């Protein structure tokens, strides 16, 4: 695995259209569970005023005046304008995701069940309050389901929305944690984690979002294009029209790959692919 190609071995080869499920006939017990999931999800949204910012590697504009990254896909620095939106302060947890699966009449993911029942390890990271790791399509369907049942335009974030939010409104912040500082594992003031912890275990970034630097990665709505920044439109960019992998953002495998500008990618049908959070668009 490289820092920028966040790929796992297990792949679920299911057509995207088959995953666009709808609610089964819900029981009297499930109806309030459904409404609770929807209400909690939207109550956890953080309002983010839109604005204009410079997206990409801004290292030449600050401090040492040198690029932060050697990855050419983070360049050129380019202007982006975004409308107001809301973003979930937490990644969706296994507890939330598995409740959603049950509402669809679906079983827990096969690999999740195998690991959960394993006698080799306790797999703490599969606990209900830990970030879920799912395929891109399941993540997108989950977010759109929230929108369909709440009358709101809910989806996965675009890559531009995510970077703008991680940088707390597009500021020149290279780390998405609470103080824009790198803290090594032995540092008692460390405020992010490279491995799994319950969602929201560390302080949020300045606008109130948790785990934008560590504790996994987030799926983006966008297809990945290594040269996309060369032709990205300024207004609310949505990514390339097509591709083979989807963008992921967050902790990508090393301290050098925790930057708010770092771009990763993963196959959208990877079953245990990435974490995710939803956005609400106007």
Predicted regions and their residues:
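Intrinsic structural disorder/low-complexity segments
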Residues: 11, 36-38, 180-182
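Functional-site microenvironments in short loops/helix caps that host divalent-cation chemistry
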Residues: 54, 58-59, 64, 118-272
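Compositionally biased, low-structure terminal segments
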Residues: 4-5, 17, 256, 277
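Bacterial N-terminal signal peptides that target proteins for export
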Residues: 2-10
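Bacterial N-terminal signal peptides
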Residues: 10-18
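Extended beta-strand/loop cores of jelly-roll/beta-sandwich
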Residues: 19-160, 251, 263-282
